[in-house]
UniProtKB/Swiss-Prot annotation:
Region listing for Disordered, in residue ranges: 337-356
CDD domains: HTH_LacI, PBP1_AglR-like
Organism whose genome encodes this protein: Rhizobium meliloti (strain 1021) (Ensifer meliloti)
Entry function: Probable regulatory protein for the binding-protein-dependent transport system for alpha-glucosides such as sucrose, maltose and trehalose.
DNA-binding region, residues: 5-24
InterPro entries, per database record: HTH_LacI (IPR000843), LacI/GalR-like_sensor (IPR046335), Lambda_DNA-bd_dom_sf (IPR010982), Peripla_BP_I (IPR028082)
HTH lacI-type domain residues: 1-57
Encoding gene (name): aglR
Keyword Transcription in record: yes
Xref: Pfam families: LacI (PF00356), Peripla_BP_3 (PF13377)
Keyword DNA-binding listed: yes
Protein keywords: DNA-binding, Transcription, Transcription regulation
Stored PANTHER family: HTH-TYPE TRANSCRIPTIONAL REGULATOR GALS (PTHR30146:SF109), LACI-RELATED TRANSCRIPTIONAL REPRESSOR (PTHR30146)
Descriptive protein name: HTH-type transcriptional regulator AglR
Length: 356
């Protein structure tokens, strides 16, 4: 049975006030004492009385999320995986989410209401766009926040956790180029989101280093579903000069692309190579595809947990985190990538000389 505050204090040989201040992040409690208290909390299963803490500290012990309701976002399994990481960390620290659905055009007003309500101590934002106005707005509201991703243009002095998307797709494209591929297709996420912009940039950079250009006809942007991956791949394969390799911004897109490739009677890794970005979705493991996928790997759940840890640490004055974190994706080579196939035309037969 979990202990109460008095029992926890007696166990530690500290006053209830000291234990309470350690739990609430007061700076006058030294690091050693705070560490002892937190360790005892983990061992005993102690849960603080949040109602009493709110009265004592003025904190809500809640993280705010403005939930986008634009088409294709609310049902996105990638967003769900990110939220799962956030939720796991929040539960660990007995924090809550305050979810506020909002259409894109109402987002600013929703954030303002959330900040004014006092129901949250901090917020996070995701689905970053170029020159994203939300960063300056949150700064003006003076509410703590962390960004999942980065904007392009605008201010640079804001806290974020992001994946090096340019570097990830540069590495992937360079591998394909080293294998002899020069017609590389891209099945990407929504065109206006910065992770998609940066992934395309990585591919363009790798091609340019070898004097090659990206064929715009071999690029498709969409919501990241298997059906969109299927349709995009079908379209590419019907072209007069189809790609010999394809980059997919998600294993979900790759699932559809693989279906189209199989229906066309092509062999993955031989007739066409495929690399996908792996967000480490538990229900879709790249090694379990019929042909194991080469991937760039970075966990969405880990990113969600990290952002929650940073927000909670800031609220409780615990932990020392870098302002900006750019994670490198790991390139994992499997069987879906191989040398470019020889698609050169057959030579014309030599004319016969003379006759019988």
């Amino acid at each position: 049975m979990p202990v109460n505050l008095k029992q926890l204090a007696e166990l530690l040989g500290l006053s209830q006030t000291t234990v309470s201040r350690a739990l609430n992040g007061y700076p006058e409690v030294n690091a050693e004492t705070r560490a002892r208290v937190l360790e005892a909390v983990r061992e005993t299963g102690y849960r603080p009385n949040r109602a009493a803490q709110r009265l004592a500290t003025g904190k809500a012990y809640s993280i705010g999320l403005v939930m986008p309701i634009a088409a294709g976002i609310d049902s996105d399994i990638h967003f769900g995986e990110f939220l799962a990481g956030l939720a796991e960390e929040a539960v660990e620290h007995d924090f809550h989410f305050v979810l506020n659905p909002s259409a894109p055009e109402d987002e600013e007003a929703t954030f303002r209401r959330l900040a004014a309500s006092g129901n949250v101590d901090a917020v996070f934002i995701a689905y970053m766009r170029a020159n994203d106005p939300r960063i300056e707005m949150l700064k003006a509201l003076s509410i703590p926040f962390v960004v999942h991703g980065r904007s392009i243009g605008g201010p640079r002095d804001y806290p974020f956790v992001d994946v090096d998307n340019t570097g990830a797709f540069y590495d992937a494209a360079r591998l394909l180029i080293q294998l002899g591929h020069n017609r590389i297709a891209l099945i990407n996420g929504p065109e206006h989101l910065t992770f998609s912009i940066r992934r395309r940039k990585g591919l363009v950079r790798a091609l340019a280093e070898k004097g090659l250009n990206l064929d715009d006809a071999l690029v498709h942007h969409s919501a990241m579903t298997d059906e969109h991956g299927y349709r995009s791949m079908q379209r590419f394969l019907k072209r007069p000069a189809p790609p010999t390799a394809v980059l997919c911004s998600s294993t979900v897109l790759a699932l559809g692309a693989v279906r189209a490739i199989n229906q066309a009677g092509l062999a993955i890794g031989t007739d066409i190579s495929l690399i996908a970005h792996d967000d480490v979705l538990p229900m879709l493991k790249p090694e379990n595809f019929s042909v194991p996928l080469t991937t760039t790997r970075s966990s969405l759940r880990a990113a969600g947990a990290r952002i929650a840890k940073r927000l909670i640490g800031g609220i409780l004055n615990q932990g020392d985190y870098p302002e900006q974190e750019l994670w490198r994706a790991e390139l994992i080579v499997r069987a879906s990538t191989g040398p470019a196939p020889d698609r050169s035309p057959l030579p014309n037969p030599s004319p016969q000389v003379g006759g019988a």
